[in-house]
Structure formats: structure tokens, C-alpha cells
Amino acid sequence: MAPSFDTLSEQDLHEEEEEEIDFSDLKAQYEVKLEEGLDTFVVIDGLPVVPEESRQKLIKFLLRKLNTVGHTSEDAVFMPLNDKNMSEGYAFVEFETPEQAVAAVKQLHGTPLDKKHTLLVNKLMDIERYGREGRIDEEYKPPAIEPFKEKEHLRSWLADPNARDQFALHRGDKVGVFWNNKNNPPENVVDRAHWTQLFAQWSPKGTYLASVHPQGVQLWGGPAFSKQKQFPHPFVQLIEFSPGESYLTTWSARPIQVEEGQSILTYEEEGKNIIVWDIATGKPLRSFVSHDLTAGPAGDAEPKKKVQWPAFKWSADEKYVARMLQHQSISIYELPRMNLLGKTSVKIDGVMDFEWSPATVTREGVKQYEQLLCFWTPEIGSSPARVAMMSVPSKEIVRTRNLFNVSDVKLHWQSQGSYVCVKVDRHSKSKKSMATNLEIFRVREKGVPVEVVDSLKDTVINFAWEPNGNRFVLITTGEAVAGAAVAPKTAVSFFAPEKKGGAIGNFKLIRTIEKKNSNAIYWSPKGRFVVVATVHSQTSFDMDFWDMDFEGEKPEAEKDFAANLQLMKTIEHYGVTDIDWDPTGRYVVSSASVWTHQLENGWNMHTFAGQTLSENPTDKFKQFLWRPRPPTLLSKEEQKQVRKNLREYSKEFDEEDRYAVDIANTAVVEKRKRVLNEWVAWIRREKELLAEEKDAYGLPEEADDPKLAKDAAATTQEQGETVVEEIVEEIIEESEEVIG
């Protein structure tokens, strides 16, 4: 019979009272939230203790600080008094919105009120949540100190004796990291299934490999690629590292919903799309709602929206990060506190895009520190379009350029910040035809002069500066004919400055290659060599390998240019979608990703001169990612010395290559010898077993001879033994013939 209340003994009732069941975990899980209506309140501690008659004066002084981050009033500030009519050193403040309360905590916590007092600002519900009875142990317990564990060397791959580079391969549900072995098959470092759910991405200096999951982002590193950091951002879709790997930006289309008990994300991230993280601590610095961009002119229909990415753009030294609210402003934040520079955004009517200089530039005649930012605005009413260069942190406009009949503008900084090319697409007055001209700002020269390249007759569809150089390549195309099934041909143009003593002359056209299908430009990270290719095409797959400093004879017409152009080789890779140079500029990988099409996916390895080293068809191939290298630690003088002795080093490298080939050949010969010896040993062993069987059956050693075997059979029969002869018929061939 099942037990009931009536059948319980008195002892059972008392045992239930003595051993009370602990429901604390269930209470915490299903606790009713009482935060509604109190999320606009903050508690400010660290205030001066003043008498009642000075309280209003202190409140008015405090309001100056509070109203910089939100809106409140004297009536919304409550400062309690004790029995002696003295304030207690804290106050309760109500803001108009929860967002203002969050801003007060973020921006005012830890800021000085005066020389002797520092504000400590917390949300009221945080104090209620964490200070509730039972949440904090009244008795101090020293934290447990974990035993020291030596961390892995995050740049161990740079110590490879052969100075090899690594790359990551993403195919199917597997991601692997491999050593590049030139002509030989790559050497596996690690290969894991389900390492990432979306994509993999290296950090800019190669320290971390990022994997992206529905729960957030994880960073991996060290010789064994162990987990280094994780950043919880539900349904994250895009990530971006800062140039020095100090910060990480994550984005999701879904607003964040912070779950109860989440240890890293707080109410500040609730409803946001973007988080800026500190990689060293793994903590969020600040979160934001994303801004959409309009995809183009609206016309009669509602303009399409697209994601603004990267949402935040970093200065070269990571001291500043900026985001744009299209058509309105640029907001510049100071790191690491993520405070708005000057407490206000830069209002720019109509702003369409901006770009930081990729390097810290020293302009002629300017001694103070600055970072440069370039932006452009379209034509508004009778006002012309404008390109401007701003100095940060002063926010001073140091150069402007007015433009007319502008359809679109693209900003291209040279890698050292020496130039910024403004690619201007202009329409005719009738707006029936388009053409492009280039406005090149010479940033390091006094006054930032602008050089105009207006010799282009068609529209530029691609432009790329030489890394650490002063040459560039561009691709132009004519206007597409309405209804035409074939896209118009393209032309590839190479530009270089004129020779002008020690100075850099004007940019001049070296050569134009007509009637091409090329649409992409890939410079070697070391400059000089460039691949001009056709990617994402269904009909053309050519890759042209060019040398801008060919050591052969120079054409007479190009003797005044700081370049000697030479086509080294043209190859094809069917279905090519991506081209990637290794960090040293020695190897190029072309790949065909399943993310674009499903025909002949895989990757091919080439030298800088276009010689194909290997072809690697790979089922469900997705990504090929060279591991970046950090900047060299050698000084400019040491680098100069290395270049000077390069021929001597080359002899050593050639000797090492020959030795490696000899070792490889020796390994092949040794393997063949080993296989031959194993075969000879097997033959010997089989012969010995055969001889033992012959002895057992009384067969002579020469029984393999047919004549001797026949005589042996006759002898056996004479001795009275029975010999069974088996005849086996085997049909060799059948044919059917019809007669008559």
C-alpha cells in the first residue's frame, strides 16, 4: 500500500522537521524579479558628509556631473540624513530612462568629484541583487590561489628552424592547421572536427585562431592550439580584431538577451547587437545597437538596408576607435575606457564613409601626436561633394577638397599612410555616362598637396596600392550595354611615379593591358609582385603574375618611371574564388570555395612567379587562411644589413634546399631498399616452408620439374599408393556463329 499522511508515524513527522530540505537553489532559479520600475535608479557613494543646510548646495554641484550623461533634477535626488542631521555620504538618483542610468554607471563610476572624493556609481538593482541576505558571506574567506601553470608560448611557430609558415584549412566540418613544406605535402599540426560552426579567422598578427559558434567566439593558440579566451555573444555572425590584437568586435543580427546567471554579459548588453571586448581580460568594454546602411539611391522604392561592417574602425595605434551614423556623424571613442572623445560626436551632414590612416603619420611641420581620419560627403543642394582629412584627437580639419558631379567615392590609404587615393566616380551633366578620376593626397608633404589623375576614360572597378610602396594598379571597364549577355571587357593599368632625383614625382601611366576579363588585384605583402586575376566568374579563370621591378632590359618608353613591368606567367584555375599571398611573399594560393560554387573545389599552391607547385582538389573545401606574421623585430639598419648580405644568405639557403632534397631522395631509396629486403626475406621464408613440406611428403627437392614430378608419381604408384588424377575444364572463350 502506498504511504499516506494517515499512515505516517509521529517519528516520521519529527524526522521531516529535523532534516529540512534545502530549496535555496530552486528559490534562486524561480525567484520573482522585482526590478520593474527600479532600473532608472542609481546609488552614488563616496560623497562628502555635509550638514543639512549644505545638502542642497551639494546636490546642485552633483547635478552638473549627472546631467552630462542623462537627465535628472533636484527632486529626483534623495540624500538621507542621520540622527545628527548629517548626510551619510551617499545618494539615490532617478534618471528618466534605464539607458541614462546605465550611462551614469559606465561613465561616472570611478570619476573624481573633487580632489578628496571619488564617485562610486552602481545601479540600485545591482545592490539589491548582490547585497540581498544570503548572497554575500559575512565571514571573510581568503580566495583560493590556484597552483602556477606555465602558459603556452603563443608565438612558438615563429621559432621553426626552417622558418616555415603555417596555414589553416577549413573543409567540411573539419579545420586543420598545417606547415607549408614547399614542394612536399603539408605537415599536419592539428586537425579537429566541428572546430567552428561558421568560419575560422586568424588575428592580425597570427597569435590567435578564432572559431565562431552560436554561443560566441573562442580564441585558440599555442603549440597545441589550446583554448585561450572565450567571448559569449549569442548567435554571433561577424567578428573583427583591432590591428594590435588588443580588442575584438563581435556582431549579431539578433539583439542580445541576457540570461539570469550569466557571469560576463550584464544588463548593459541587453538589446544590443555589437560588443567591443578587451582580449586580455575577456570582458566587454562597451556594447552598441547596430546602424544599418542604405544600399543605394531609393528611387520610388524603399532603399535596401545592409550591415555596416566593420561597424567600428580602429586607429593604427589602437588609441581610438570610431563608428559612423550615416548622413549624420562620426563618433570617436578613446581606449581602453571607451569614452566618447570630447564627450560629443563629430557632426558631419551627409557623411557617407570614413577610413583611418593604417599607420601613424608625421606630417611635415607638425610636431604633436596625431592620428589621421579621412571622410567624404555627397553633394547636398547647391553644396559640392567634399573629401576632408581630420586630425585626432584635436578633431581639426587639416585638408579639404571639393568635388562636383559625384556619383560615388572610395577612399584608399597606402599602407604606410603616405598617400590616400580618393577614387571619384563622376557622371556627365546629362547623367548618361560615367568616368573616374583619382585625387591623390600626398599626406607627408607640406600642406598635403593633391595630385589629380584624370586621364582615365572608363569607370575604375578595382584599385590597389603597392604595400610599403608608391605604385598602384587599377582595373577599368566600359559601360555595360543594356540586354547584353556578356559583360564588357576590362583593362588593367599600371601606374608609377616619375623619377625625380630624391623626391617622388607625379604618378604616370606605365602601361595598359586591354581586352581582359580581370576584376581583382592581389599585391604581394612585400610589394614588387602582383597577381591580376579573374575571380567569381563562370567563363574566365586567368591569373596574371606581374613583376614591377624586372631585372631585364627596360623599354625605352618607360625609362623615366620608377618601375620595370614584366608579365612572368599566366595560368588558369577553374572556378577560382580567392587568392592569398603568404606573409613572406614567396607563395600564392588560389582556391575555389564551396561557399561560392560546388564545382572542382580545392586549392592550388604557386610560387610568386606563377609556377604551380601542387594541386589539391578537396571535397567541400571552404577556406584557406595563411597564418599572419607579426612585424619584424629587426631595426631598419639591421634589415638593410640583411638585404646587403642577401646573396650570401641565398647560398646557404640553396645548400639547405639541396640537402633537404638529398634527404628526401635518401628516404625514398631507403624505403625502396627496405621493401626489397622484406620481399627477399619473404621469398626465402616461403622456400624454406616449401622444402619442409616436400620432406614431409617424400618429394625430392627437384619436384618442381614436370618430368621429375611424373617419375615421382609413377614410383609412388608402384609402391602401392593410390594416385587420384583430377581433370579441371575451364572455358576460355565462347563464340556463336550463325550458318546459312
UniProtKB/Swiss-Prot annotation:
WD repeats lie at residues 193-230, 232-289, 302-343, 455-496, 513-556, 571-609. RNA-binding component of the eukaryotic translation initiation factor 3 (eIF-3) complex, which is involved in protein synthesis of a specialized repertoire of mRNAs and, together with other initiation factors, stimulates binding of mRNA and methionyl-tRNAi to the 40S ribosome. The eIF-3 complex specifically targets and initiates translation of a subset of mRNAs involved in cell proliferation. It is found in: Cytoplasm. This is Eukaryotic translation initiation factor 3 subunit B. Residues 1-20, 695-721 are annotated as: Disordered. InterPro entries: EIF3B, eIF3B_RRM, Nucleotide-bd_a/b_plait_sf, RBD_domain_sf, RRM_dom, TIF_beta_prop-like, WD40/YVTN_repeat-like_dom_sf. The keyword NADP does not apply. HAMAP family: eIF3b. One of its GO terms (biological process) is formation of cytoplasmic translation initiation complex.
